[in-house]
Amino acid sequence: MNKHVNKVALIGAGFVGSSYAFALINQGITDELVVIDVNKEKAMGDVMDLNHGKAFAPQPVKTSYGTYEDCKDADIVCICAGANQKPGETRLELVEKNLKIFKGIVSEVMASGFDGIFLVATNPVDILTYATWKFSGLPKERVIGSGTTLDSARFRFMLSEYFGAAPQNVHAHIIGEHGDTELPVWSHANVGGVPVSELVEKNDAYKQEELDQIVDDVKNAAYHIIEKKGATYYGVAMSLARITKAILHNENSILTVSTYLDGQYGADDVYIGVPAVVNRGGIAGITELNLNEKEKEQFLHSAGVLKNILKPHFAEQKVN
C-alpha cells in the first residue's frame, strides 16, 4: 500500500520563510518541502544549507528549490512572501503593497492545479488571508491564516513567567486581529486549571494592573523586536510549524488561527483570530467561547476594524 507523501510548498524564502523551513525539518513535520522565491539564488542557497543538516534531522525530508508548478500536488502552500513591516509601521499599513503581491502569487499557485490548503503568514495576516480566499476560489475551510497563534503563545509565555508555571500549563487565548485591536480572553484564562481571576483574588502578590501590562507587552512585542533586530521570524515560524503539524497529522488541535466567521461571535464575512479545530481538511470547526460583555465589545470592534480595511478592496464585502 502506498503511503501518502506529505508535501509543503513554501513561497517566500525571507526571514520568516527560511525559519519556517528550518522548523519543519528540525521537527520532521513533512516528507517533502519545496522552496519558491522570486530570488532564485536565495532559495537555492537555503535549500543547500538545509540539506547539509539532514544528517541531524529526526526523519528524511526531501527538500528542493521549485517553481509555482510544484504547488500542483502540495498538501499545503504556505505564503511568507511580501513586503516587510518597517519600524513604526503598523501591519494594516502594509495592505496596499501586499494585496498586489498576493494577487499574483495566488493566481500562479491556482494555475498549477493546486487543490490543497493555503496557510498565510504575511502581514496584515487577517486581511491577506481573506484576500487569498477571494483570489483562490477555494472553500473557506481550506484557507487559514496564522492569526493570533503567536500572540497566544506570547501571552502564555509571559503569564508563565509571571505565575511561575510552564507555558504548556497556562491556558489563555488572544483573539481578534493579529495587531493593535487584539484582546485577551481573561474570562477563560487559567493556570493548571485554576482561573487567573481566582489566583489574583486569593494572592496579594498578583495584581490586575500587572496583568494588564502583560497584555500591552504582548500587543507591542513585534514592535519591540523590530526595533531591536529589524524583524520577527522565529516565533511566527514556530507557530506556522505548529499549524502545519496539526494539518498534516490530522490532529483536530484547537489553535487561534485566522479563520472565516459567518455569524460566530456576532461577526460576519471576515477572517479573524479565534480558537478553531484544525485537521487534514483545514478548519473543521470553530470553538465559540462564551465571552463576557467587555470581551464581546472588544472583539466586535476588532472585527469592524478589519472589515473597514477590507471594504475599499473588495466591493462585495459586507460591512455590519
UniProtKB/Swiss-Prot annotation:
Q: Which domain of life is it from?
A: Bacteria
Q: In which pathway does it act?
A: Fermentation; pyruvate fermentation to lactate; (S)-lactate from pyruvate: step 1/1
Which locations, inside or outside the cell, does it occupy? Cytoplasm
Entry's induction text:
Strongly induced under anaerobic conditions. Activated by ResDE, Fnr and ArfM.
What residues does NAD(+) bind to? 15-16, 37, 42, 68, 82-83, 121-123, 146
Keywords from UniProt, A to Z, are: Allosteric enzyme, Cytoplasm, NAD, Oxidoreductase, Phosphoprotein
Modified positions (Phosphotyrosine) in chain numbering:
223
Q: Name one Pfam family in it.
A: Ldh_1_C
Residues that hold substrate according to the record:
85, 91, 123-126, 151-154, 232
Entry GO terms, CC = cytoplasm
Q: Which reaction does it catalyse?
A: (S)-lactate + NAD(+) = pyruvate + NADH + H(+)
Q: Where does beta-D-fructose 1,6-bisphosphate bind?
A: 156, 168-172
Record comment: activity regulation: Allosterically activated by fructose 1,6-bisphosphate (FBP).
CDD domains found in the cross-reference section? HicDH_like
Q: What does this protein do?
A: Catalyzes the conversion of lactate to pyruvate.
Could you say which protein family the record assigns here?
Belongs to the LDH/MDH superfamily. LDH family.
> What name goes with this protein?
L-lactate dehydrogenase
Taxonomic lineage from the root? Bacteria, Bacillati, Bacillota, Bacilli, Bacillales
